[in-house]
Amino acid sequence: MRMRFVVMVILLPALMMSGSECRSSCRLTNISITVESEECGSCITIDTTACAGLCKTQESVYRSPLMLSYQNTCNFREWTYETYEFKGCPARADSIFTYPVALSCECSKCNSDITDCGVLSQQTLGCNAH
């Protein structure tokens, strides 16, 4: 019995350290964005990085109307923008598509000034058949 206790005491810090990664797994992930330009008559798939994962959160049992409640979500901390230019577009067509590329991520309150804070669709979208 004493040996089990010693092993548990030795392993407990290691388990707690490995568990911290499980509690907050907000990190960069590779994604593909399908973009269609009807004006240019083309459809492309762009590979980029985004933020995805779980953030530690808790919900109060009692909800007070005086206290605002929010959940932390996995958001871009730093990002840049890249552009793609559609080829073979008619004159005056909008041939430039600009998209964000995540450089780092963080668990934070969603900032609706720069982010769509709604629920993401799990459905993969493709180009429309014309």
From Swiss-Prot:
Signal peptide: 1-18
Cross-referenced SUPFAM superfamilies: Cystine-knot cytokines
Entry's Gene Ontology cellular component terms: cytoplasm; extracellular space
Species assigned in the record: Carassius auratus
Gene Ontology MF terms: hormone activity
UniProt keyword list: Disulfide bond, Glycoprotein, Hormone, Secreted, Signal
SMART domains documented for this protein: GHB
One Pfam family named in its UniProt record: Cys_knot
Annotated gene: cgba
SUBUNIT field: Heterodimer of an alpha and a beta chain.
UniProt-recorded name of the protein: Gonadotropin subunit beta-1
GO biological process, one term: ovulation
Family: Belongs to the glycoprotein hormones subunit beta family.
Subcellular location as annotated: Secreted
Lineage, uppermost ranks: Eukaryota, Metazoa, Chordata, Craniata, Vertebrata
